[in-house]
Amino acid sequence: MKRITAICIALLLLAAAFGCRNAAANTYTTAAGISDAAEQPAGDTPAEEKPEQPAEQPAEGQNTTEEDPTVQNPIATITMKDGGVMKLELYPDVAPNTVKNFISLANSGFYDGLTFHRIIAGFMIQGGDPAGNGSGGPDYCIKGEFASNGFNNPLSHKRGVISMARTPMPDSAGSQFFIMHADGDFLDGQYAAFGMLTEGYTVLDKIAMSKTDSADAPLEPVVIDTIRVETFGVEFGEPEVIR
C-alpha cells in the first residue's frame, strides 16, 4: 500500500503546467493531501553510488544513430550558481523532439538564472520553471514521447536520468525537467526520459539534500547559473511545438 501511495504522490508531484493553452487549466503547485511526500522516497540512494546504465542507454559520447556512427550524442552542462557542475548525455534516438526542445531552450539562455524549485530527497529534483513555482514554461508545449502516449521510449527512470515534467495531459511538457535522485521505475512509460547524468552525482546529491518546506520547495534558492548543450557540430533545429 505504501508503494501505491508513493507512486500516486510522485505522479502528482511531477505534474506542472508550462504555458500552452490546453495545459493552463491543469496547473499544479502543491496538491492537497501530499505534504508528506518527502517521507515517501522512491528508494535509498548512497551519496557516492553511480547506477548501472540500462542496456538501452549508450555510454557517454557514443552515438546510437544508425545513419552516422561517427556522430556523438549531445552533452548538456548544468552549472550551478555555487559552482557545482552536472553533465548529462542526451539521447536524440530515444526522444528526438524532447532533445531538440531542451537544446533549443538551453542554448538560447532560457534556463539561465532559474532554479530547482521542487526537491524530494530519494526521489528527484525538478527545475526549469521561469515562474519558480511549477506553473511556468515557454508558452508552448511539446508532444509527450513516452509509451502511454503511443511513443516507444525504452529509457528507464533510473538514478541520474533526466525527464520532462508535465500536467496530467500527455502533450503538456514545456521547459520543466527533473533529474532522478533515486530509481523510479514506476514513472516509466508515463514521462519522457531523454538523457542520463554522466558527471556530477555529488552535486545531484547535494541539491537533493537541500532543506525544504512542506511543499518541497527549498528554503534557500537552488539557482542554475547556466545550461548549455554541446552538439559537436550537429544541427538539431527547432522542436515541433503545440501552442
Predicted regions and their residues:
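Cyclophilin-like peptidyl-prolyl cis-trans isomerases
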Residues: 8, 16-243
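Positively charged n-region of N-terminal signal peptides that target proteins for export
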Residues: 1-4
